[in-house]
């Protein structure tokens, strides 16, 4: 696809990198890339570039701009001003935004001729905010999707350009759904920019006033399981927090992460929530407030994710032991 549109891109994690790659591979001219500053990561805590920056640098896209803020009146006014001036110098027609992580002030929203288009991983107005994929799985939603939105100054409140639905399967995790939605978002935004280049505009519909929910950022503390809850709810938590931060519970002072599981409808009437009912090659069965959870993939501190059979060889768990509940 050849296009006369000059496209700027703003994004940081892998979800955004997949969209940037789709735009680049479609032949759209990427005239500027914004991404969050390099962060310490890994065991050595060395500075690491974001997936978006890595893709942009390796494919010669840019300039790459990494201001800590885009607010001229904020904590980093000089860095913000320099980035906005550099972006303006590229004269973008449109900016695509995906999981950028910084607030775009009105000045930046107004800078491209056709404004800024956001790729959001939910069916707006449900799950506005930072963690829409996690929250959709955790809540037991039957479906989610991608919404393309004409950005305004609110938090994911802009008019909707396009929407596509994706069912949430019984075994879907945030990781699997992330990959599906990221690829879908890339395809959708490429198609939208093709329409924009052809027609000179993109019709958009205001979001419904009803059905607004917010997807708060995931806190590590949420990973600890509360065994008084129903097994189906705990299974959703395991799926929602895979791959980050990982659902977990303590057993005799050792924090164990749970990566794969299945909900069982029944448990002995006298079983205490958190009690281990069985531990064998098929999994570790733990009593819940209602039903039980069979955990089939586990991880101990400093170890790898392992199927139950291998995990139990290194860290035996026996019926009668009891996992602690989140305080």
Swiss-Prot record:
Top-level division of the source organism's lineage: Bacteria
The keyword Transferase is annotated on this UniProt entry: yes
Annotated EC: 2.1.2.9
Enzyme class, broadest EC rank: transferase
Residues bound to (6S)-5,6,7,8-tetrahydrofolate: 122-125
MF (Gene Ontology): methionyl-tRNA formyltransferase activity
Keyword field contains RNA-binding: no
GO cellular component, one term: cytosol
Pfam families, sorted: Formyl_trans_C, Formyl_trans_N
Reaction(s) catalysed (UniProt annotation): L-methionyl-tRNA(fMet) + (6R)-10-formyltetrahydrofolate = N-formyl-L-methionyl-tRNA(fMet) + (6S)-5,6,7,8-tetrahydrofolate + H(+)
Alphabetical UniProt keywords: Protein biosynthesis, Transferase
UniProt family annotation: Belongs to the Fmt family.
Function: Attaches a formyl group to the free amino group of methionyl-tRNA(fMet). The formyl group appears to play a dual role in the initiator identity of N-formylmethionyl-tRNA by promoting its recognition by IF2 and preventing the misappropriation of this tRNA by the elongation apparatus.
Protein name: Methionyl-tRNA formyltransferase
Source species taxonomy: Bacteria, Pseudomonadati, Pseudomonadota, Betaproteobacteria, Burkholderiales
């Amino acid at each position: 696809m050849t296009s006369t549109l000059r496209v700027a891109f703003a994004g940081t994690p892998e979800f955004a990198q997949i969209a940037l790659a789709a735009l680049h591979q479609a032949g759209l001219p990427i005239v500027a890339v914004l991404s969050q500053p390099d962060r310490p990561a890994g065991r050595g805590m060395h500075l690491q570039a974001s997936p978006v920056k890595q893709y942009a640098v390796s494919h010669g896209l840019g300039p790459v701009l990494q201001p800590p803020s885009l607010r001229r009146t904020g904590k980093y006014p000089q860095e913000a001003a320099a980035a906005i001036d550099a972006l303006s110098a590229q004269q973008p027609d449109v900016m695509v935004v995906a999981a950028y992580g910084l607030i775009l002030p009105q000045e930046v929203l107004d800078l491209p001729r056709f404004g800024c288009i956001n790729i959001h991983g939910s069916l707006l107005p449900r799950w506005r905010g930072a963690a829409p994929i996690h929250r959709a799985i955790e809540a037991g939603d039957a479906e989610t999707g991608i919404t393309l939105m004409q950005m305004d100054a609110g938090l994911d409140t802009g008019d909707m350009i396009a929407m596509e639905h994706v069912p949430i399967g019984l075994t879907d995790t945030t990781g699997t759904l992330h990959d599906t939605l990221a690829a879908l978002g890339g395809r959708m935004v490429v198609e939208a920019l093709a329409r924009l280049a052809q027609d000179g505009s993109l019709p958009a519909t205001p979001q419904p006033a009803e059905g607004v929910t917010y997807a708060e950022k995931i806190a590590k503390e949420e990973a600890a399981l509360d065994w008084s809850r129903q097994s189906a709810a705990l299974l959703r938590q395991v799926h929602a927090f895979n791959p980050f931060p990982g659902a977990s519970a303590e057993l005799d002072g050792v924090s164990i992460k749970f990566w794969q599981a299945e909900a069982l409808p029944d448990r002995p009437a006298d079983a205490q929530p958190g009690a281990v009912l069985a531990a064998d090659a098929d999994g570790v069965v733990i009593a819940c407030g209602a039903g039980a959870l069979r955990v089939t993939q586990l991880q101990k501190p400093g170890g790898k994710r392992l199927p139950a059979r291998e995990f139990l060889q290194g860290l035996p768990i026996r019926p009668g032991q009891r996992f602690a509940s989140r305080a």
